[in-house]
Amino acid sequence: MSRRTLLRGAAVGAGAVALPSLLAACSGGPSGVTLGSNASDAVPKKAFAEAFKAYEKKSRKTVQVNTVHHENFQENINRYLQGSPDDVFMWFAGNRMQYFAQKGLLSDISELWRDFDGFTDALKKQSTGPDGKQYLVPYYYYPWAVFHRKSVFREKGYDIPKTFDQYRALARQMQKDGLVPFAFGDKDGWPAMGTFDYLNMRANGYDFHIALLRGQKSWNSPQVKQVFDLWRGLLPYHQKGANGRTWQEAAQTLAQKKAGMTVLGLPHPGQQFSAADREDLDFFPFPEIDPAHGQDAVEAPIDGFLMSKKAKDRDGAKDLLTFLATPEAENIYLKSDPNNIAVNSGADTAAYTPLQKKAVRLVSGAKQISQFLDRDTRPDFASTVMIQAIQQFLNRPDDIDGLVNDIERQKKQIFSAT
């Protein structure tokens, strides 16, 4: 899909292992809708609180927010939806939403979409289940890229790499200069997926990447082995002990000028920078590997809101979702969290930071868009296979054959199941 088509309007203006109580819904009264939130980090948590406060003032209804640590929410979502979920909850567009729609765990909100304004047809498609019905209210998106500090590149005389060879050469030079080339943390299991996605799309193309994640290509193919081999060649330039470090801790080393680069999404590094230093944060697109694919594809996940099938206050949930679909709701959120991009074409982009404007240009110029590994594939495959596989690779990068054979074996088991 063309990302330009998806966000043209905006540019203009899981198996559970923890206790069920981790994701137990709040008990709501007759005037309150409950909302399951995975926004546990300080910046988005505050921004969402402002948006919900605005809704409460406007509607004279209450929103009871049940905030759960982001990773716990992700990993326990299946049990949550089958148990006693909140009326509304935060989740993602694309395959990860479609999977739960197909399982009958989401409520159809097509009637709300008939009155929505400011969303492109392609955004609607990303919010639509396999049955052709709409389930998601999209809220914002953010691209993944290679982030760095402008002052470090200026002081050291570094050039922005366009090719993978230049990327490796830059990493070698940073290491010689006493920097950790790549700040890197994968304790939560998903951050390293962004690096895999870009390596695969740059080496094998977007179509191969999506087909692989949908179970249509073999993980033990020469193409996938090449991806892990390319990654293995970069690992000497990554922070050691990534599986014991959070992405927040990794991003802090970029802010402290101890590391030179990091592959993350737009909201992530900025949250670790002080307000005074935020203007020094910059990014460049992940470099080209195969000229046939260039830098065509961009990873730019879309986040939003869903209504659970078991919602108790259905009218309240629909009323809240209708508000969250407005430019007003997005403007309020982005005022407190300038690390994302609005999806509604009516949102106010005049106050966008230079980094937000650059992110819009990056995504608008993309020929294809991916959502993210754990959103473009089945959640059970991402959670039970790929998190462990990538972390195993980071610990033992020399057994690529054994790694991909094991992934392929588990893929066949999962994708053949109903």
Positions of the model-derived regions?
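Conserved N-terminal structural module of periplasmic/extracytoplasmic solute-binding proteins
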Residues: M1-Q98, K103, I160, N243, ...
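Extracytoplasmic/periplasmic substrate-binding proteins
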Residues: N38, E50, R96-Q98, D229-D313
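Conserved C-terminal helix/tail region of periplasmic/extracytoplasmic solute-binding proteins
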Residues: T62, R154, G365-T418
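A structural signal for short loop-to-beta-strand junctions that line the ligand-binding cleft
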Residues: R79, D86-D87, F116-S151, V180-A183, ...
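Hinge/lid segment of periplasmic solute-binding proteins
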Residues: F92-W144, T195-D197, D282-F284
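Mature extracytoplasmic/periplasmic domains
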Residues: L106, Q256, P267-Q271, D303-D380, ...
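Extracytoplasmic/periplasmic solute-binding protein
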Residues: Y135-Y139, W144, R168-Q216, A259
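Glycine-centered hinge/linker elements that transmit conformational signals in sensory
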Residues: Q173, L213-N243
